[in-house]
Amino acid sequence: MKRDFNEFKEFIKGKNVAVVGIGVSNIPLIKFLVKLGAKVTAFDMKSAEELGEISKEFEVLGVNLELGKGYLDRLTGFEVVFKTPSMRIDSEALVRCKNQGAYITSEMEEFVRYCKGKVYGVTGSDGKTTTTTIVSKLLSQEGYKTWTGGNIGTPLFSNIEEIKEEDKVVLELSSFQLMTMDVEIDVAIVTNITPNHLDMHKDMQEYIDAKKNVFKYQRENDLLVINDENEITKNLDKEAKGKVVRFSSKKTEGEDAYYKDGKLYVHGKEVCKKDDIIIKGMHNVENYLAAFLAVYDEVSIESMKKIAETFGGVHHRCEFIREVDGVKYYNDSIASTPTRTLAGLKAFEKPVILLAGGYDKHVPFEPLAYEGYEKIKAIVLFGVTKEKIKAAFKRLEEEKGIHVPVYSGESLEEVVSIAKSIAENGDIITLSPACASFDMFKNFEVRGDKFKEIVNNI
């Protein structure tokens, strides 16, 4: 049940509130809480110098700042704590606050709790951003006022009073955002679940349980969209409280949306041809099938077809950069898991020179080697995980006698140079790292932009 935002305004006014993390979503949150009359203290590991102008702006607004080394030691004595998504609820600082009687929450939890519009929550190990974007575009095409947020778009909580009951809200939700989510989401989409973020989660089960929160608090009139080709998601119907619909790119029997003979169908109706979809690859067919099911009650087949035939994709996802000396370069920096890299490789019609590696999320790389070797002409590795990935390909050769040439470099510039030196006319070089970027870059966008800069300077 959606609650009246006036309740929150009354609740937060005059409260002693802590906000942990001065990042993209929390900056507008802090300003909004000040506007609502809260006494706000913002916490961050960065110094005032590192934060720059925003620290000065907050001081003018009367926001107290607790910054730098040991900043969480000072997280005590607050009535309300807004945590950053990646902060575990069982962290020492939050446990201390909870024991002191603090109400612990996050920007996304409060947004969903009080949002008047219909909420579509998209989660999964791969395909979240593209599926979220497709759902948003489908609803907008049909004429709905559509808001997009969560991991993408803009922070929405500070706009909550502008969102009307007839509006649609599409959220990309990570496992971190979902770990403490205990509110109803009207339409939940789970694209797939494979090993991911095991550096942050205690184990795979905790990761799965976090994902389940996207539909755990639904009621009988709500909708859950699941991937029938994924071993974990296909069984989620057993725990669903609302209506469940399924999609598959491989079979048609019992499916609510499916792919058959080059065409996409939803509830038995043909929507479009696979070859007419601008963004290529079977993983994008699955993203479209999921999105079609999510919006079926609101969006016409005509609008679905139009978006499929005109939407050119999201930056850093199998994005063509340029062709140099007969070699095509693609940026797939979003691929931060082996399964997402495999999906990207399958979008190409020939084996590619793959640039991979990065931050270690403690996921296995054997699937990349054992399922991807036919699509890899050579692999050039970089980052913290390069030895782990190299070991997976060595194991492939020892066990199956399949050799994939493996090279490695220290920087992105070096691996591009190596790839360029081994490429022949007609080859494809793609950055599809199978890892997060945090060992070398702030995020996957910065990594992708750097790659594009290097390629454009060849």
UniProtKB/Swiss-Prot annotation:
Top-rank EC class of the record's enzyme: ligase
Catalysed reactions, semicolon-separated: UDP-N-acetyl-alpha-D-muramoyl-L-alanine + D-glutamate + ATP = UDP-N-acetyl-alpha-D-muramoyl-L-alanyl-D-glutamate + ADP + phosphate + H(+)
UniProt keywords, alphabetically: ATP-binding, Cell cycle, Cell division, Cell shape, Cell wall biogenesis/degradation, Cytoplasm, Ligase, Nucleotide-binding, Peptidoglycan synthesis
InterPro entries, alphabetized: Mur-like_cat_sf, Mur_ligase_C, Mur_ligase_C_dom_sf, Mur_ligase_cen, MurD
Enzyme Commission number(s): 6.3.2.9
GO cellular component: cytoplasm
Alphabetical GO biological process terms: cell division; cell wall organization; peptidoglycan biosynthetic process; regulation of cell shape
Example of a GO MF term: ATP binding
Pathway linked to the protein: Cell wall biogenesis; peptidoglycan biosynthesis
Protein localization: Cytoplasm
Keyword Cell wall biogenesis/degradation: yes
Pfam (any one): Mur_ligase_C
Annotated ATP binding sites: 124-130
Task of the protein: Cell wall formation. Catalyzes the addition of glutamate to the nucleotide precursor UDP-N-acetylmuramoyl-L-alanine (UMA).
Family: Belongs to the MurCDEF family.
PANTHER family assigned to the protein according to its UniProt record, in alphabetical order: UDP-N-ACETYLMURAMOYLALANINE--D-GLUTAMATE LIGASE
Family matches, as NCBIfam families: murD
Entry protein name: UDP-N-acetylmuramoylalanine--D-glutamate ligase
